[in-house]
A protein has these predicted regions:
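Sec/Tat signal peptide C-region and signal peptidase I cleavage site
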Residues: 22-26
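Bacterial N-terminal signal peptides that target proteins for export
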Residues: 1-11
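Bacterial N-terminal signal peptides
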Residues: 11-19
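Beta-strand-enriched cores of mature, soluble protein domains
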Residues: 27-138
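Short, intrinsically disordered low-complexity segments
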Residues: 4-5, 16, 29
Length: 138
């Protein structure tokens, strides 16, 4: 009888820990940084495309394109497509060189991906910087 109660207690503990594991990992915010350059491209909706030159997030490596799809006032819709996934977001510009971009959800490897970054540029706007945090989950 005691061994059955002990087994049930152990199983209950395991189930409780398994239920809490996704919650713990979902809330884990991590630092994010990338550098990108942008070039004119008449085939793109807004006439330019940006390419990641360096990233400390392995799923958005150097060479990844960031596309800007539409704009409404100071808000520009953006899309990042990687091998086996994508995510969409919005960048709100406060000046020609300052913005905040927010991405959420996604597909494939970027399912439940969330990203919030501050966008800045170097003096001649040849390199753009994204600095902020990312996490997976709701």
């Amino acid at each position: 009888m005691h061994s059955i109660k002990r087994s049930l207690a152990v199983m209950g503990t395991i189930v409780a820990l398994m239920a809490l594991a996704p919650v713990a990992s979902a809330g884990s915010h991590r630092a994010f940084h990338l550098d990108k350059t942008c070039a004119e491209d008449g085939s793109e909706p807004l006439g330019y495309i940006c390419t990641v030159q360096h990233s400390d997030f392995k799923w958005i490596p150097a060479g990844t394109d960031i596309r800007y799809l539409s704009e409404d006032g100071n808000v520009v819709q953006a899309s990042i497509e990687i091998r086996n996934g994508s995510t969409d977001g919005a960048c709100t510009w406060s000046s020609d060189v300052d913005a905040i971009c927010v991405f959420s959800a996604g597909t494939g490897r970027l399912t439940q991906f969330n990203l919030e970054v501050v966008v800045t540029a170097n003096a001649d706007q040849s390199v753009w910087y994204w600095d902020g945090t990312y996490w997976f989950g709701d």
